[in-house]
Amino acid sequence: METTIGILGTGRMGVRLAQMFARNGQRVILGSRDLDRAHRIATGLALEMLTAGSYEAAANADVILPAMFLRDGLLETLEPLRHYFDNKVYIDISNPFNDTYTDFILPWDTSGAEQIQQQFPNARVVGAFKNVWWEVFDAPTFGEGVSDVFVVSDDAEAKAMVLNLVENTPFRYIDAGRLANARTIERMTLLSGELGQRYGYFPRMNYKLLGEPWTVGQRDRVAHLIASHPTT
């Protein structure tokens, strides 16, 4: 069964995500309050699976993905559409940046994802693409390393559905656990922006989790040294 994705917002992230999903074979409705703008963008992208529409048309899709800033009134914009969200998978890409991208407009003990889940308790919120800057979508591979996307949710079934939707897109997707982990991921994105600007990478940078298998019970190579000094 074909899944339609409704993207609300025609900024840099919304357009990149619409392009990515449409290229992946999903039907996408790019929703905007300015229909002429949405049609112009959809025509310019020239993708068979992409059409333009209103916010209402996008919100009526099987999966919704609002691409707006919290600081610009995301929650207020979505409030009149809340009846579309009941029992629907909502992909949250929001980061609660302030106007200067130097801090967040939310306190440490919450996240954009949690605020959305609180505002729309019947939506099945899945946080994803929070750690990805817009320019990375054009080429998600750095050298031989494919960029990671951290995916969080308290709804295991909704998370699995999103992971299935993105399976053939050009990123590696990491199951990053519960929705509250969005607090950490959003702040990691804030840090990556600062580091990227400091070292001249912004906005062409991303995270990648590196590691190698570790055998359970394998001894630490310096365990005997640590054990001989238990008080330090």
Locate predicted features.
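General beta-strand structural signal in soluble alpha/beta enzymes
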Residues: 51, 124-128, 174-176
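Phosphate-coordination loops involved in phosphoryl transfer and adenosine-cofactor binding
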Residues: 1-4, 87, 146
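A glycine-biased structural micro-motif
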Residues: 39, 60, 86-87, 122-125
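Rossmann-fold NAD(P)-binding glycine/threonine-rich loop
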Residues: 94-135, 139-141
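Active-site-lining helix/loop region of Rossmann-like oxidoreductase modules
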Residues: 147-232
